[in-house]
Design a protein with these regions (language model features):
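PLP-dependent amino-acid enzyme catalytic core
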Residues: 1-109
Length: 109
């Protein structure tokens, strides 16, 4: 998303690679989606490691299986990049392969 806002228009990402955050990324954004996205004020960039830690945190503390895209919001909040003060992270969806989820959260404390 940050690259879209920098470009000011939909762009194609040649170097995109798939990850467990499949609901929040892809090779491009549909042109029909740009009018819905363009009014947003910006985006927050988080790493895959930060998202994985956020998914584990949600599983441990809230007992919720969160997919990668939902983990992005929690990662932004827990890293402090979402701003100061109280932050609400909406965690929706559990569309993640169970084996992948287990590999992210681990099996031990």
């Amino acid at each position: 998303m940050s690259r879209l806002f920098d470009a000011g228009a939909p762009v194609h990402f040649d170097n995109w690679t798939a990850s467990f955050v499949d609901g929040a990324g892809g090779k491009s954004v549909l042109a029909s989606m740009w009018p819905l996205l363009s009014p947003l004020s910006g985006s927050i960039v988080v790493t895959l490691d930060e998202v994985a830690r956020a998914i584990r945190l949600v599983a441990e503390r809230a007992h919720v299986i969160a997919e990668g895209a939902a983990g992005c919001a929690v990662a932004a909040a827990t890293t402090g990049r979402a701003g100061k003060g109280k932050v609400v992270a909406v965690v929706s969806g559990g569309n993640i392969d169970l084996a992948r989820f287990l590999s992210l959260v681990g099996t031990g404390p």
